[in-house]
Regions:
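A preference for well-ordered globular domain cores
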Residues: 1-117
Length: 117
């Protein structure tokens, strides 16, 4: 089974494709991700791939928080005083929106992860 994901917006474009089907749909671009034979569970927005039913399902709150914490850990350096970029305020806003996810949404199905600056 092949899945094509829009890497920019994290949308699943096609899933459950055969080798022949994916060849005609995959456009060479860095924007699209082709996945197969998953070593890890792909996650797209607030959903993850359930390998038993080969479809995307909503994550649990625990998984959402783990994802959020991973993103925060990987972007910590952008909040340090020595960060060389001129987009530090945008990163701080983005990181605050990530921290606010559990308070801002009542249901995991409604979560919209903020867009990275």
């Amino acid at each position: 089974m092949f899945t094509i994901i829009d890497n920019k917006y994290k949308n699943v474009l096609y899933t459950g494709l055969s080798l022949e089907e994916r060849t005609s749909k995959l456009v060479p671009s860095n924007r699209f991700v082709l996945t197969e034979n998953y070593a890890t569970t792909p996650q797209v927005g607030n959903m993850k791939l359930d390998k038993t039913i080969h479809d995307f399902i909503y994550m649990t709150w625990k998984e959402v928080k783990r994802n959020r914490d991973d993103i925060l850990a990987k972007t910590d350096w952008k909040d340090l005083p020595g960060y060389p970029g001129d987009d530090q305020e945008e990163w701080r806003t983005y990181r605050q929106e990530l921290r606010d996810l559990p308070q801002d949404y009542a249901e995991v199905e409604d979560i919209v992860f903020p867009t990275e600056p």
